[in-house]
Regions:
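Post-DEXD/H (motif II) to motif III coupling segment of the RecA-like Helicase ATP-binding lobe
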Residues: 335-340, 346-426
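Helix-hairpin-helix
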Residues: 1-17
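Conserved RecA-like ASCE P-loop NTPase motor core of nucleic-acid helicases/translocases
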Residues: 17, 272-279, 432-438
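Upstream accessory/linker segments immediately N-terminal to the RecA-like ATPase cores of bacterial MutS
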Residues: 56, 62-218
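C-terminal helicase module of SF1/SF2 nucleic-acid helicases/translocases
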Residues: 415-431, 449-627
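Structural detector for short beta-strands of small beta-barrel domains
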Residues: 31-56, 94
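ASCE P-loop NTPase motor cores of helicases and related translocases
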Residues: 177-329
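Conserved motor-coupling elements within RecA-like helicase/translocase cores
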Residues: 305-322, 329-336, 471-487
Length: 627
């Protein structure tokens, strides 16, 4: 069968077909013992009819057991008596009922083929056609040629070519056993990883970059963590390659990714580097860090929406590193000398924005700049594994210093306790942030808005600052608060990247309305420099299991795993469905070991088989490289 014909059934590949398991089975095996619930076939002789109130009862005789049996039909059609003619001998298939020694079958079918287990598919196609399709294509040889291990292939074959023992176990468990479920999960994961790997396209690098970053690292007033050094080495290898780098660098809040960004600039030097950040506050903060730590010989420039600099002129001059916001996307830039393009907090940008940033530095279609994306929003290992098929992934899984943050769930009765804590922190010259869910009052919210709560805090504490995403002066407010403030009233705008070194406490109102990743980013604003930190979750639902799990874990990677359990994974292939399940059998939060095995198997493969043999996965049933 050709790939086109397979596509008529809605499948693009043999492995995809192999995960389309039957929803159930019917047995035409001859029943070998008469007991309640026995399913299968009996050879019977028709003796008489009895009809009443839209019910037809046919008295018959089970020949193999020499026992009477009643065949019952509700709302019988006229053809029933033709199928079960008096004195005829037929094979009937159904489920046996034993009512106190009186045997019966409800709505039995007449069959011509006996001693078979018939798969039943949920499909708009004819069941017979699906059986023909699966039984002709799904064989041990074909599945192993697709790369599946023999144990997985064997279990999958049994799904579509069931025997009596398989059917017995299926009926007893009312579903597939663990070995069969494992095979379905493995096949689905393997197929998905394979599809992702073919989505990746590599290009030649504009420049091979071999700048001496090690000397710069050794000159720093502190030592990079082992994780930072490992990731720097991975990036250095990328940038020295003839192939354009395409790498995502992930780490927890406070993992020190800024130093990895600056090290990457040193690797690219003397060629130029470009960095885009999601907000001007974060971009300016990165600019200040670059000025502080990079050699004074480097010319570093910050570009904001208000900047009047001529970028063409800048790049024609000796500028080495440009840092900016999305304003970079709307400026004329000569990208000839740009070797490295980076985006910080990459998830804050759309795919089109990141692509356009890359295009700024691309001179021709045959080569591309090195691309690095940075994120302080960890994702689970299984999702990182999926990402890694399209883009290289590095993980900074170590913090420069351990974070000491106590997370407490509170509700209204404990508000005085919270107030006392805030007073103590303010008196100790430490800062507090209070995060509101809304700026203005809303009838739909049971919580106070920022505007409603503002007067309460201003009458009790000095140096109270207030801002939100709607505030045009928010960046100025944040800067003033960082220098002089005691309490900051804000929305989630402080979620990403903002440095508030004196912030010891964050109070998040209505945390149940926020995603766990956002909660973790907000909590990560405190204890930035080893300061003892406190996070209070003020909620009307203190018994929330989701919030309790969040409060019990500090690691962003643990939080990502918990979030995955509640939210499920999005579709990495097409960028759709960032929430909601897309897997039929596998579970990203529970099947990590299966992901590891499938990924290792796929990584070990040097090539994908290609053949004109229709049994081959590279052949007519749908080549893997066609995904």
């Amino acid at each position: 069968m050709s790939a086109q014909e397979l596509g008529k059934f809605g499948f693009s590949h043999l492995l995809e077909l192999a995960t389309f398991a039957p929803s159930g089975y019917e047995s035409t095996m001859l029943i070998d013992s008469l007991h309640n619930g026995a399913q299968g076939a009996l050879e019977v002789q028709i003796l008489s009819y009895k009809g009443y109130a839209k019910v037809l009862q046919i008295s018959a005789y089970a020949l193999a057991f020499s026992q009477p049996i009643t065949l019952t039909f509700f709302h019988p059609k006229p053809y029933i008596k033709r199928l079960f003619a008096l004195d005829s001998v037929v094979f009937v298939q159904g489920v046996l009922r034993d009512d106190g020694g009186r045997l019966s079958m409800i709505q039995p079918k007449t069959i011509r083929e006996i001693n078979a287990i018939i798969p039943k598919f949920k499909t708009t196609h004819k069941n017979a056609d699906m059986i023909s399709l699966t039984q002709s294509l799904i064989t041990q040889e074909a599945l192993q040629e697709c790369g599946l291990p023999s144990d997985v292939a064997d279990s999958l074959v049994r799904i579509f070519h069931p025997d009596k023992e398989f059917f017995r176990i299926f009926c007893a468990r009312k579903g597939f056993d663990e070995k069969t479920l494992y095979a379905l999960k493995f096949c689905e994961i393997y197929c998905h990883l394979l599809r992702l790997s073919t989505k990746r396209t590599d290009y030649a690098a504009k420049y091979r970059c071999t700048g001496d970053y090690q000397s710069w690292v050794e000159s720093l007033p502190f030592t990079l963590t082992n994780a930072q050094q490992r990731v720097c080495a991975q990036i250095a290898s990328d940038l020295a390659s003839h192939k354009a780098a395409k790498r995502l660098v992930m780490g927890d809040v406070g993992c020190g990714k800024t130093m990895v960004i600056l090290a990457s600039v040193m690797m690219a030097y003397p060629k130029k580097s470009l960095l885009m950040a999601p907000t001007s506050v974060l971009a300016k903060q990165l600019y200040e860090q670059a000025l502080l730590y990079l050699p004074k010989s480097l010319n570093i420039t910050y570009i904001s929406a208000e900047s009047k600099q001529d970028l063409q002129g800048l790049f024609a001059s000796q500028v080495d590193f440009i840092i900016g916001t999305q304003a970079l996307l709307y400026r004329e830039i000569s990208g000839e000398e740009i070797a490295l393009v980076m985006s910080d907090e990459q998830h804050r940008f759309g795919v089109k924005q990141r692509h356009y940033l890359e295009k700024l530095a691309q001179v021709d279609s045959s080569s591309k700049p090195h691309i690095l994306q940075f994120s302080a929003t960890p994702i689970p290992r299984t999702m990182a594994m999926l990402e890694s098929k399209m883009i290289d992934v590095s993980i900074i899984d170590e913090l420069p210093y351990p974070k000491d943050i106590t997370t407490t769930i509170i509700s209204k009765p404990r508000f005085p306790e919270l107030l006392a804590h805030i007073s103590a922190e303010v008196q100790a010259a430490r800062q507090v942030a209070i995060i509101y869910p809304l700026v203005e009052e809303s009838q739909a919210s049971e919580y106070l808005s920022l505007k409603e709560g503002e007067s309460f805090w201003r009458t009790r504490f000095p140096q109270v600052y207030s801002t939100s995403g709607q505030d045009k002066e928010k960046e100025k407010v944040l800067e003033e608060f960082a220098q002089n403030g005691s309490i900051l009233l804000a929305t989630t705008l402080i979620e990403v990247g903002i440095s508030l070194p004196k912030l010891s406490t964050i109070v998040i109102i209505a945390p149940e309305k926020l995603g766990l990743a956002t909660l973790h980013q907000l909590r990560g604003r405190v204890s930035r420099n080893g300061l003892k930190g406190y996070c209070y979750l003020y909620t009307h639902t203190p018994d929330s299991a989701r919030l309790r799990e969040f409060a019990a874990h500090l690691s962003g990677f643990d939080i990502a795993q918990i979030d995955l359990k509640y939210r499920k994974g999005g579709d990495l292939l097409d960028g759709k469905r960032q929430s909601g399940a897309q897997w039929i059998w596998a579970d990203l939060s529970e099947d990590e070991a299966i992901f590891d095995r499938a990924n290792a198997l796929l990584t070990d493969k040097k090539s994908i088989p290609k053949s004109n043999d229709s049994r081959d996965c590279g052949g007519a049933v749908g080549a893997l490289h066609d995904f």
